[in-house]
């Protein structure tokens, strides 16, 4: 993709407005339109970006429901931990390093297209395999029988159950991995990197809130479609369900192809003519030609700011993964207690999660909250997510602690902690889904906004590579560490019910929250200083490394 400041020699300057004029028009919107600060000249560009982001968000939201359904019905909640460690972590690391290698010779735009093409092919392949799954997949009971009636269930062998189940249901495992990779690579990394390179700092800041609204409309639509999917699924026989699943994946493949065509039109038609002349405050610095991944990591090792960004991503993902794992086990236990089909019972809470998340995020972005980073400060918005995480410890993990005490299945000291009574599974499940949703809401509306606004202040020379480190590597590392913790508790406590480890889980998350808050305070000072002086954020590294960042350039125009 061409850099946003290009082609300035191709068009007469008098035909192109300045960025300040565009900003003045966009910021003059009144009423509900003040939350869609898009100038008339930017309508087509924003519409194409919004449609792309909406499609990407819809696929991810629906895939999340599908992957949980496959795990609950075909495998066990504990297999999620195994998949995240032994499948997703190495795959994501390999793909992140592949992206870094490709950045040496290809643009972010080109890499984005390549990965979209790869996922489209994968979805088409899955759609075809569903039609012949019975002929090509191993017997559903190939490994399950080994763990029936206590077979191989000793403490030294029970941990292998998760591994065998992932092999027993390979298609379910592939669906789970593809959903995670689509979310982390395409949605969270490649599209946002593409957006970063397509916009100036001020344009990016205006586009992000309405784009978040669009992707949450997709989330709401996904929950609605999922509800219809589960109702239809109940009426169909097995083979008919296979045809339905095949159609869903083939349709998703065509949606990805549509994203590729929209991107091509955006670059070759809409962005062919520059939209405005970039002001000095938004002017990008020329990127250094060849920056290796090892060089990026070397500079990062000297940068307190990038280390802090990586740590907050790490702490969020570990904490979220621990809460999610506890929640999903609680859903399975409750489904068995109420004698309900696990896939349907899990799907109900997934839809509640998506409805709640989408509606609240849309409302927040149609309110003054969407500009709180600018009006109230980075620190206030940055602290929201760790505070919600702390509330999840008290209320959700507290309810899980109470239920394990009532079941007398918790740690010894926990079993006698509360007076006698019945387990409150409904309370635990609803606390769980509420805080799962709140963590997503604060991630999308606060955590990610702070991270992206700070990321836009990083020198463009290293921005994409650094983003792949703190979002790509540390994001997946956090999820995997959370999963490793789950497997360790699974083995150490000789149980498949991670709620037994609730006291340990709560203590670890609390320690993370303390360090998380300290990192946010540091990042806030750096961001506010950069905004105040209208410059790149100081990534807090040695003077020798800083010298390689500055390269002067002439004023340019933006696509």
Curated annotation (Swiss-Prot):
Matches recorded under Pfam families: TLC
This protein's GO CC annotations: plasma membrane
Region Disordered, residue ranges: 1-22
Keywords from the UniProt entry: ATP-binding, Cell membrane, Glycoprotein, Membrane, Nucleotide-binding, Transmembrane, Transmembrane helix, Transport
Glycosylation sites: 8, 196, 290, 403
GO MF entry, a single one: ATP binding
Function: ATP transporter involved in the uptake of ATP from the host cell cytoplasm. Provides the microsporidian cell with host ATP in exchange for ADP. This is an obligate exchange system. This energy acquiring activity is an important component of microsporidian parasitism.
PANTHER family hit by this protein: ADP,ATP CARRIER PROTEIN 1 (PTHR31187:SF1), PTHR31187
Protein's name according to its UniProt entry: ADP,ATP carrier protein 1
Natural source organism: Encephalitozoon cuniculi (strain GB-M1) (Microsporidian parasite)
Gene that specifies this protein: NTT1
């Amino acid at each position: 993709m061409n850099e946003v400041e290009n082609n300035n020699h191709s068009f007469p300057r008098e035909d192109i407005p300045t960025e300040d004029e565009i900003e003045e028009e966009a910021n003059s919107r009144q009423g509900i339109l003040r939350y869609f600060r898009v100038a008339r000249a930017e309508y087509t560009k924003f519409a194409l970006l919004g449609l792309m982001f909406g499609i990407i968000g819809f696929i991810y939201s629906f895939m999340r429901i599908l992957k949980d359904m496959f795990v609950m019905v075909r495998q066990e909640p504990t297999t999620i931990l195994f998949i995240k460690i032994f499948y997703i972590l190495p795959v994501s690391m390999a793909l992140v390093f592949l992206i870094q290698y490709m950045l040496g010779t290809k643009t972010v735009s080109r890499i984005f297209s390549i990965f979209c093409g790869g996922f489209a092919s994968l979805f088409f392949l899955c759609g075809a395999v569903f039609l012949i799954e019975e002929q090509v997949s191993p017997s559903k009971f190939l490994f399950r029988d080994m763990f029936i009636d206590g077979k191989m269930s000793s403490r030294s062998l029970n941990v292998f159950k998760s591994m065998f189940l992932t092999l027993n249901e390979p298609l379910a495992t592939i669906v789970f991995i593809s959903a995670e990779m689509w979310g982390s690579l395409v949605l969270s990394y490649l599209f946002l990197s593409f957006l970063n390179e397509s916009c100036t700092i001020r344009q990016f800041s205006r586009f992000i809130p309405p784009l978040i609204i669009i992707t949450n409309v997709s989330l709401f639509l996904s929950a609605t479609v999922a509800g219809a999917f589960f109702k239809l699924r109940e009426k169909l026989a097995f083979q008919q369900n296979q045809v339905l699943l095949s159609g869903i994946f083939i349709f998703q493949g065509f949606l990805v192809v549509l994203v590729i065509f929209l991107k091509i039109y955006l670059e070759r038609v809409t962005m062919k003519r520059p939209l405005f002349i970039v002001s000095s405050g938004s002017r990008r610095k020329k990127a250094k030609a060849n920056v290796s991944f090892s060089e990026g990591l070397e500079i990062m090792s000297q940068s307190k700011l990038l280390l802090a960004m990586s740590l907050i991503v790490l702490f969020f993902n570990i904490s979220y993964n621990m809460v999610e794992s506890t929640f999903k086990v609680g859903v399975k236990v409750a489904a068995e207690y109420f004698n309900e089909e696990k896939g349907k019972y899990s799907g109900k809470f997934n839809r509640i999660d998506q409805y709640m998340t989408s509606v609240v995020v849309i409302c927040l972005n149609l309110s003054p909250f969407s500009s709180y980073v600018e009006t109230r400060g980075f620190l206030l918005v940055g602290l929201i997510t760790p505070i919600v995480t702390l509330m999840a410890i008290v209320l959700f993990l507290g309810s899980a602690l109470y239920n394990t005490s009532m079941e007398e299945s918790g740690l010894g000291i926990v079993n006698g902690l509360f007076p006698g009574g019945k387990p409150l599974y409904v309370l635990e499940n609803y606390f769980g889904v509420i805080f799962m949703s709140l963590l997503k809401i604060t991630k999308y509306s606060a955590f990610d906004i702070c991270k992206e606004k700070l990321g836009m202040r990083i020198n463009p020379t290293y921005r994409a590579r650094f983003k792949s480190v703190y979002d790509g590597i540390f994001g997946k590392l956090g999820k995997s560490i959370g999963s490793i913790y789950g497997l360790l508790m699974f083995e150490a406590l000789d149980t498949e019910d991670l709620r037994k480890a609730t006291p340990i889980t709560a203590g670890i998350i609390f320690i993370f929250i303390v360090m998380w808050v300290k990192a946010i305070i540091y990042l806030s000072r750096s961001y506010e200083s950069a905004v105040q002086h209208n410059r790149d954020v100081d990534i807090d590294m040695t003077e020798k490394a800083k010298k390689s960042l500055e390269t002067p350039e002439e004023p340019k125009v933006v696509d």
